[in-house]
Amino acid sequence: MKSGIIFSADATNGSSRRLGVSIEISGPFTGNTLELRFPRWVPGSYFIREPIQHMSDLCAEIDGVETRAKRIDVDGVRITGVSAASKVLLTYRVLAAEMTCRANHLDESHVHIMPPYTWMLPTKGIASERLDFTHKIILKKPEKWTTAIQLSGKEGEWFAEGRDEMLDAIIESNSNPMISFEVEGCKQYLKLWDSGGHKIPEEGLNRFIEAMKLVIKEHFALFGVPDWKEYWTVLHLTESGRGGLEHLRSQTSMMPRKCLQEGNEEQWRDLVSLFSHEFLHQWNVKQLRPKNFLNYELQKEVHSNLLWWFEGLTSWLGDIICLRSGAWSEDDWRKDWTRKMKRHTDRNGMAHESLEESSHDAWIHLYRPNSYSREVQISYYLEGEMAIFCLDVELRKRSNGKYGMDDVMSNLYHTYRIGTDRPGISHQEIRKTLVNIPGGRRLGSLLDSLVGERKTPDVHSAFKKLGMELVSEKKTNGAWIGLN
């Protein structure tokens, strides 16, 4: 059923760095007042970003007649006199100058659109169930550009089923070719853009595509071939920027362009790892969620004590999949783990903050760091991965190598994902699934300790159980200047 709401963006004036935006809402209206608000955060990025700060030139019309659009609170707009209207049109411009994977960016070479930071949503004045209906999205752009977007429709006009799909419909449009390939019947799309207009190295690109195929196939081996048959990867290449954000059936990732250039193996590993991490989020975030994230409240902070699982497990398993698939060699994994261990040992936060506390306080800690943070705070990404590694080693030891934390993740996904009888998880469901897997019966207390206590996981001991040992690198002697 159509929602009667059309969300439009105009990206034809790239030199202005501002998107033209319109929202057209057809009646009926439930009262005389219509209110619209920007989402203040997006899942996967736990920070109140206040996108309304980038809005300008706000105007409104009721049935073609200009009317006042009044700003309300920190995130919204109010229009009155709509009770008998057949159509309300809201227009404004949005500054799109921040080059990150979490923001709008427009210039003469491309546009990257984050729907939550582009379009306001009606929160009062229409029947709330209309937000669950089918919305139309329109993009006006230069003729030579083609668009990566996970929605159905045709170039320049697409349809989103409900609020969440509309907000998660990342848009990347530029003149670069759309690359596509299939893995086990699922179509994969890759859309690249270089911020400096540099030519994308063909050999490095082909190498990345082959790595993508291996990683995707390994995900399917663990979870099964998904019902969704298309996935879109947007990759921005920059001088030094790095980041990634998962979306429904898509991702936007950003890497230094040298990751595709010959001789930059560390950046290459990071690129493959980042792709795998964001791809894995289709199962561990988009489908398997904390119970209080099943229906997102996007106007205020929503806390979870489980980000150590949703990011830490994803970091660990994403890289294990890189290794198992053959996209990484064992040497790649060892070198990347060494890099992580250096970060792990270069801070003291585990004595002051547990993984559950770090997860809960993501809004004020991980996303608001200061120069003293590492003394008393931890990253639920890094330390969550270390905790999962320790659990995995212990589970494999007790099950004679037959089961690991990948099996725990797979069982959780199939039992508690969206669409099942019991969607959503808490610590209790993770614990229950762990102790019920062969070899995990006595690991509940270890799980509780690793995530609930303020102490460092014993990674050295875990490696010894694998018959391996972590050895400190030899210190390089400094130059002698002739003074004693």
Where are these regions (language model features)?
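Beta/coil-rich, acidic/histidine-enriched accessory regions frequently appended to metallopeptidases
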Residues: 1-4, 19, 418-484
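Acidic/His/Gly-enriched intrinsically disordered linker/tail segments
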Residues: 288-296, 301-381, 416-419
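Surface-exposed beta-strand/loop patches in extracellular or lumenal glycoproteins
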Residues: 19-52, 120-142
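Zn2+-dependent metallopeptidase catalytic core
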Residues: 51-54, 132-149, 159-166, 197-231, ...
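Juxtacatalytic substrate-recognition/specificity segment
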Residues: 180-307
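Non-catalytic, glycine-rich low-complexity segments
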Residues: 1-15, 22-25
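A surface-exposed beta-strand-loop module
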Residues: 11-12, 24, 45-108
